[in-house]
Amino acid sequence: MITFAEDIKDVSIYLSLRQQVGWVSLTKEQAQQALDHSLKIITVYDDECPIGMGRIVGDGAVICYIQDLIIIPEYQSRHIGSMLIERLIAYVKSITLKDSRMMLCLMCAKGREVFMKTWIYGKATRQLGPGMIQYIRVEES
């Protein structure tokens, strides 16, 4: 049975899910900090086995990002990602201040654009411009 659990900050689950979808590996310290600084974490389970997760990060007043939306390959195309994103969006709506608006953004993993368009996340427009990303690396001296 598919269930959703909120605010479980389990580094081993996070790192395992990232590894199962082939994402860049993180140190345990990075992963713990990422989880600790998330506004909301929702983990998806099939019975007691973690099969996905998603996080909301941001300032909680003006801008939030959907981050690390993961469903492991053998559970993709079963609408689990849609159920997860519905819960993440509902959370952002619940924290949006009355008579204001929250900007909800994401960086879409390559090949997942069609899924994200379902949720009205489109490509760059003349009004909004493209999303950009820069990775910052600091080497130990």
Enumerate the language-model features and the residues they cover:
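Short amphipathic alpha-helix that is part of the acyltransferase structural core
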Residues: 1-28
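Small/polar loops that bind or transfer phosphate-bearing groups
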Residues: 6, 67, 107-108
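Conserved beta-hairpin
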Residues: 36-54
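Conserved acetyl-CoA binding element of GNAT-fold acetyltransferases
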Residues: 63-73, 77, 130-133
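Conserved acetyl-CoA-binding loop-helix of GNAT-fold acetyltransferases
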Residues: 71, 77-92
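Conserved active-site alpha-helix within GNAT-family acetyltransferase domains
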Residues: 96-130, 134
